[in-house]
Amino acid sequence: MAAEQRKIIEQLMGSNLSNFTSRGLVHFTDRKVCRSFLCGICPHDIFTNTKMDLGPCPKIHSDKLKSDYERASYSHDYGYEWDYLEDLERHVDDCNKRIDIAEARREKTKEEEERIDELMRDIIHTDHSIEVIITEMEALAKRKLVNDAVKHFIELNRLKTYRKELYDEVISMNEIPSQASTTHQKLQVCDICSAYLSRLDNDRRLADHFSGKMHLGYAMLRNIARDLRAQLEDREKSRDKKDGEKQRDNLASFEDKISTSFVA
C-alpha cells in the first residue's frame, strides 16, 4: 500500500517529486536514498497491511533514481548490494529472534502445565493424608487419648496450610483460561515468519497461512538474502582470484625486467 500511494502521489505531483529534498534534486548516491529499493525491494514495502507492517520507509524511493543506479552500476560497483544484504539479514535476524521467543513461550507453557499436574497430584495426596488424620483423630478422641489427638490436630493444620499453598499456586498459574492453555500446547511456530500454527488446523487454513502476505514476504526476504549473499561472496572470491593473478603477472613481469637488466 505504501509503494502504491507513493506512485500515485508522484503521478499527481510530478515524476521528479521523490528526487527532491530541501536542497533540491538528489543523486542516487545520496544517503537519503533507500539503497534496498535501488538494489531490489525495500522491506518496508513488503509487509504493508500485515501485523508486521513497518510503516513508510524514511528514505527516498524513486523509480527514476533506481533506473539511474541500474544503468550506472553496469560500469561501476558502488557496493550498495552489501548494504542491501545487511538490511535484509537484519530483518531476517529479527524474525529469527521472534521465532526463538515464540518457541520459548510455547515450551514455558508446557512446563507450566507439567507443574500444574504435579501440584494437582500433591493436592490429591494431601487430601488423602488429611482424611486419614481426621479418621485417626476421631478414633483417638473415642479412646480419650488427648495428647495423641492434639499432635494429630497440629499435623492436620500443617497439611491444610500446605494444601492451601499448593492450591494458591495452581490458581495463580491458571489465570489464563484452561481452554487457551490447552490450545497453546497444540501450537507450533512457523520457522519462516514466526506465526503460531495450530496442529488442529485443516488443510485450507494451513494453505491460507502459507499463501498469506506475511509468510510469503519473509520467505521472499530469506530467499533473496540467501541468494544475494552467495552471489556477493562468489563475486568477492572471483575478484580476489583475479587480483591474485594480476599480482603474480606483475611480479613475473618485474622479475623478467630485472633479469633482462642483469643480462644487459
UniProtKB/Swiss-Prot annotation:
Stretches for region Disordered: 233-264
One GO CC annotation: U2-type prespliceosome
Subcellular location: Cytoplasm; Nucleus
Coiled coil: 83-126
Keyword vocabulary terms for this entry: Coiled coil, Cytoplasm, mRNA processing, mRNA splicing, Nucleus, Ribonucleoprotein, Spliceosome
Gene Ontology molecular function, alphabetical: mRNA binding
GO biological process: mRNA 5'-splice site recognition; mRNA cis splicing, via spliceosome; mRNA splice site recognition
Composition-biased stretches (Basic and acidic residues): 233-258
InterPro entries in alphabetical order: Luc7-rel
Subunit details: Component of the U1 snRNP particle, a subcomplex of the spliceosome.
Protein family membership: Belongs to the Luc7 family.
Function in brief: Component of the U1 snRNP particle, which recognizes and binds the 5'-splice site of pre-mRNA. Together with other non-snRNP factors, U1 snRNP forms the spliceosomal commitment complex, that targets pre-mRNA to the splicing pathway.
PANTHER family noted in UniProt: RNA-BINDING PROTEIN LUC7-RELATED
Entry protein name: U1 snRNP-associated protein usp106
Origin species: Schizosaccharomyces pombe (strain 972 / ATCC 24843) (Fission yeast)
